[in-house]
Amino acid sequence: MNLREKILKNGLYSSLLLGINNQTKTTLHDMSHMVNSSRDEIVHASMYSLLQNSEFAGRFRERGLEPGYVRGILENILDEMFKGDFSEEHTVRIARMTFDLIRIGFPPRMLIMIMFILSQEIVRHTYPNSNQVKAILQACGWLLSNMMESYFTIEEEVFANSLGITSASYNRLLKLTAEKIYRNIDKELA
């Protein structure tokens, strides 16, 4: 399976699993005006939370990236959440955005924190009803699933290129390592 097929398969799988349908898309698109009217507050509060994290702030300082870059990332994610259509091209845009974030040094936990902090601020500043909250969570889940798939795709490529390990071998090693850690977790965490 090539890169595009793998990414698109995950996008479709995530949409189905999360129950994203036309109603979800309509709800998100209808909410975009609420989000846009609170955009500055949402982005500012999210930036403040993220930049309070020393690791996150350190990554930006190390790379000489300005706060405007963080703002751009958050605004791009907002656009993808509320104006995207969960199509194949939307899935590819999320993969490209994620590859760029990984390229500048964002580990998965930072991607997760970005999504949850941003979602929290969206809810805090837009006062959504329960159907809107559900749609926000669905969009967040879909974006995050596609971000993680992009990350794992890069990780598998690294193993394949540097060690000659196939995707199946990588997954087997992952499972075996998880089993070993699981068996020893009490000793490791004591």
Label each PLM-derived region with a short phrase.
Residues S38, E66, V70, F86-E89, ...:
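A generic short alpha-helical patch detector that favors 3-5-residue windows
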Residues M1-N2, S14-I20, D79-A190:
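Long, amphipathic alpha-helical coupling/dimerization segments that relay conformational signals between
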Residues P67-E80:
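Conserved alpha-helical segments that form or flank metal/cofactor-binding pockets of metalloenzymes
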